Amino acid sequence: MTRSILCFDIETIPDVEGIKKLGLVPSGLSDEDVVAHITKDRLENGKSEFLPHYLQRVWVIGCLFKDDRGLKISCIEPSNSDSTLEKAGLVKLSSVNDLDEESRIKKFFNIIEKYSPTIISWNGKGFDIPVLNYRAIVYGLSAPRFWDQGESNRDNKFNNYINRYHRKHLDLMDILSNFSSRSFASLDHMARLSGFPGKLGEEGSNVWNQFLSGKEKEVKAYCETDVVNTYLMYLKYLKLTGSVSNEEYQDLISEIKNFI
């Protein structure tokens, strides 16, 4: 395995403020009515109810980080979070404006700045990273190491996070499909077919309703399950490509089982 890896997954909600700013809905609507209105409008015009990437806001970022020191699985917390209050159930997001999205995204890119890990995703190049990039632009964030394609470090010219065919960002869905959208498969289905748990509980399509209900804890658990499944599929990929032996694969599987 590489020196350090970061499996990640994001859960998003509609960018209500962005929708209002662009004049896509009548003024004076509540957050809930904004989303209901634009969803209805899109469906009536033959579009998907799923909003485009640039109209998504990042609510949860789940991460599995592994290096020589071991494993860590968690969701990135905003700078103003108070774990004691959160555990006591005293912190609840009451509106989109309470979401410290900027802090979460900044921390995600800071992990890359500090460790330069190989990042692992399932459809991360198609969804997660474009959303993170758009939101980082909106907030005026800086992520030079993520964007470096050899300008600062010559080695990054040949293996960087941006090039679709490089392995610095390994999008498992993309590479296993041989970069063909006609062959894409869901993480849940492939994980279950491979003998892993797959998704447990909530579906990504239900995140907005979970947000309105203040169920951040449940969505975090759902997101962390996704990153674990992504990591397990990554281990299968390492075995498939001969990057690890069968014995090494079994050791890595035992490690994650014992950790969980």
Enumerate the language-model features and the residues they cover.
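Conserved "right-hand" nucleotidyltransferase catalytic core of DNA-directed polymerases
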Residues: 252-260
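Metal-dependent phosphoesterase core characteristic of DEDDh/y 3'-5' exonuclease domains
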Residues: 2-4, 56-59, 64-98, 105, ...
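Entry/capping segment at the start of metal-dependent catalytic domains
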Residues: 1-58
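Alpha-helix capping and helix-coil boundary motifs
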Residues: 27-43, 83-84, 100, 215, ...
